[in-house]
Amino acid sequence: MDPTISSHDTESTPLNETGHPNCTPILTLSFLVLITTLVGLAGNTIVLWLLGFRMRRKAISVYILNLALADSFFLCCHFIDSLLRIIDFYGLYAHKLSKDILGNAAIIPYISGLSILSAISTERCLCVLWPIWYHCHRPRNMSAIICALIWVLSFLMGILDWFSGFLGETHHHLWKNVDFIITAFLIFLFMLLSGSSLALLLRILCGPRRKPLSRLYVTIALTVMVYLICGLPLGLYLFLLYWFGVHLHYPFCHIYQVTAVLSCVNSSANPIIYFLVGSFRQHRKHRSLKRVLKRALEDTPEEDEYTDSHLHKTTEISESRY
């Protein structure tokens, strides 16, 4: 068993050798995860349907489509995991191997989600800082290629993590090396996300040549902020605390469930962010989900957007008179 995902074992221990109180799962948190995942799956399914079948593909929409796919995958893993925890709580049968597999499977969408978010922030940062170079040298299908590479790399890391954890008892050094690689990769992604987001924020808000604020940059900023608050703690718990061999006793052994709830909130919040940003300052009669999502991903300043909308309405009125 991979020590990075040994939270199931720490929570089901009746009494440890130090005499600390029993650390059983908190049922309220499991039900909270169930509710959060259902809401998040509904929102991400709508995003997948709109971007996959109802809207024209653009560079940013390819990233958002894959991010919604990673969030849905992650929420599915935690939905089933919480269901098994509730079954265990009431004394019904739940195979331990299934929970271990789910714990390792959730690593795949977690890595891919962070990678896609870092790619979005980095690409928009390059577009703002060096626009001419970016538009001249960017390959046409770069978004799809990057997302495909991210998924392949995430699956390879997830499979390696599971396999090394399976052999962890006899090959202790193996899972340590694999976990070190995954931890280093996550730290690199976090630094890339933080650096590119900070540079993008400074370029938009500060300096003599500030870039006009658009809905797309508001969407990216809110998504990154929610991830840093809600999504990052789970990664710190799984890949740093357990890699350094920190054993959490009561009441800190419940940190895994708390970070799981926060990470589910992070994956569920992204569709809400898209629809809130897209529906801001929009007339109610024009609030179709497709239109709202399209506006949330538009890289057009508010003034230009208002002008284009006003010209479009004027054209429609003039055409209706003839």
From Swiss-Prot:
Extracellular side: 1-30, 81-100, 164-179, 245-257
Gene Ontology molecular-function annotations: G protein-coupled receptor activity
UniProt KW keywords: Cell membrane, G-protein coupled receptor, Glycoprotein, Membrane, Receptor, Transducer, Transmembrane, Transmembrane helix
Gene Ontology, cellular component aspect: plasma membrane
PANTHER family found in the cross-reference section: MAS-RELATED G-PROTEIN COUPLED RECEPTOR, MAS-RELATED G-PROTEIN COUPLED RECEPTOR MEMBER X3
GO BP terms, alphabetized: chemosensory behavior; hematopoietic progenitor cell differentiation
UniProt-recorded name of the protein: Mas-related G-protein coupled receptor member X1
Location relative to the cell: Cell membrane
Sugar-modified residues: 16
Organism this protein belongs to: Mus musculus (Mouse)
Biological role: Orphan receptor activated by neuropeptides terminating in Arg-Phe or Arg-Phe-amide. Mediates its action by association with G proteins that activate a phosphatidylinositol-calcium second messenger system. Its effect is mediated by G(q) and G(11) proteins. May regulate the function of nociceptive neurons by modulation of pain perception.
Tissue spec. comment: Expressed in a subset of IB4-positive small diameter nociceptive dorsal root neurons.
Pfam families (UniProt xref): 7tm_1
Topology class, membrane: Multi-pass membrane protein
Transmembrane segment boundaries: 31-51, 60-80, 101-121, 143-163, 180-200, 224-244, 258-278
Ranges facing Cytoplasmic side: 52-59, 122-142, 201-223, 279-322
Family named by the database record: Belongs to the G-protein coupled receptor 1 family. Mas subfamily.
